[in-house]
Design a protein with these regions (language model features):
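Functional beta-strand-loop-alpha-helix junction segments that form "active/interaction loops"
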Residues: 52-94, 294
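Active-site-proximal C-terminal subdomain of hydrolase catalytic domains
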Residues: 138-236
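Sec/Tat signal peptide C-region and signal peptidase I cleavage site
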Residues: 22-26
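Amphipathic alpha-helical coiled-coil segments
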Residues: 307-325
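Caspase-like cysteine protease fold
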Residues: 30, 205-283
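Bacterial N-terminal signal peptides
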Residues: 10-21
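Glycine- and acidic-residue-enriched helix-capping/strand-helix junction motifs
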Residues: 37-53
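A short, glycine/acidic-enriched catalytic loop
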Residues: 102-133
């Protein structure tokens, strides 16, 4: 399935050799894990959230880079094998996104994400992330007590009771979102439902760029959770947290993506996908700004902007030619 973003362009046909100058696009590998639901209503909620998240993922990455685990297939052994393969497939510029949708537990020392058979521990999750090439890998954990997972991965003690979340850790290898601020918030959470909802919501797209970033999805979900407890007239039993850098630049979904008709012009389809790939390269470059330094960052950004403008003109020229021939 090809998913592309609708564009408005200016006409001018440029040399096809221009595309040869565009570097290979870094890949986004997305893994959606649906854990044990237990009661039927929780199972239904997790089913719905996983489907919404997977649909959003398909607006950003190809089907072969989206892997879904649910039911009896969502085992610890299967996940360990999957991430071992990711470690072989991914390059230094690639990124990974891991969604953990389900229940969790914390006994005061160890966090576990509930799966059929042996559970995934926080140490398991950290080991999976540590083994991946590159940095800025994203994890969403919607379970109760998920804040305890953040504590182990970052090495920074989780806040207790009504304390504020600590500042980000020094590493930028991880971008972590948890439904709770620590391991003491043990009730089933609402955060995952609203986070999934944000991925297709124009209300969540604060900067109106047709992309939903980690930051935008987090802010939307946090506000909806707060409103839920306010409307219910009850004390909040969950307080989400976001840790790490680059949340505003890490896109999770693309709004208004369209599926090309079967009879669409193959050249236009290819050019639109290449235009979207350039958009993704700009987002990835933004994540590396501090690493590159301002001068090199601006040089690469200018180059990408010029290529984007030139490719945009090629697309419009091709659209004009295609329309004239109909």
């Amino acid at each position: 399935m090809r998913m592309v973003k609708p564009m408005l362009m200016k006409p001018l046909l440029l040399a096809p050799l221009l595309l040869a100058a565009v570097p290979a696009q870094a890949a986004l590998y997305i893994t959606v894990v649906q854990g044990l639901g237990g009661a039927a209503d929780y199972q239904q909620q997790f089913d719905e959230q996983s489907k919404v998240i997977s649909a959003a993922a398909k607006t950003l990455t190809s089907d072969d880079k989206l892997t879904e685990f649910s039911g009896d297939a969502a085992t610890r052994a299967a996940l360990l094998a999957h991430f071992a393969q990711l470690n072989q497939n991914m390059g230094e510029d690639d990124r990974a996104a891991l969604y953990l949708i389900g229940h969790g537990s914390f006994d005061g020392e160890e966090y576990k994400f509930n799966l059929p058979g042996p559970d995934m521990t926080a140490q398991d999750i950290k080991s999976l992330l540590d083994a991946l090439p590159g940095r800025n890998h994203f994890v969403l954990n919607t379970s109760s007590t998920s804040g305890a997972m953040v504590e182990l991965i970052t090495g920074v003690p989780a806040p207790r009771d009504d304390a504020e979340a600590p500042a980000d850790s020094s590493t930028d290898k991880y971008l972590l979102v948890a439904a709770t601020r620590n391991g003491n918030e043990r009730n089933a959470t609402h955060f995952g439902r609203y986070f999934a909802e944000a991925l297709s919501s124009e209300d969540a797209d604060i900067n109106k760029n047709n992309n939903i970033s980690v930051q935008e999805a987090y802010d939307y979900a946090a506000l909806q959770v707060e409103a839920y407890f306010t409307d219910a007239g009850s004390l909040a039993t969950e307080h989400s947290q976001l840790r790490g850098s680059g949340a505003a630049q890490f896109s999770l979904s693309r709004l208004n993506a369209i599926e090309l008709a079967p009879d669409a012009d193959p050249l236009i389809a290819q050019l639109l996908e290449e235009r979207q790939a350039l958009d993704t390269q700009v987002e990835e470059l933004q994540l590396r700004r501090s690493e590159l330094g301002n001068t090199e960052y601006l040089r690469q950004l200018q180059e990408l902007i010029l290529r984007t403008a030139e490719l945009t003109e090629r697309i419009e020229a091709a659209q004009g030619t295609s329309g004239a021939g109909q």
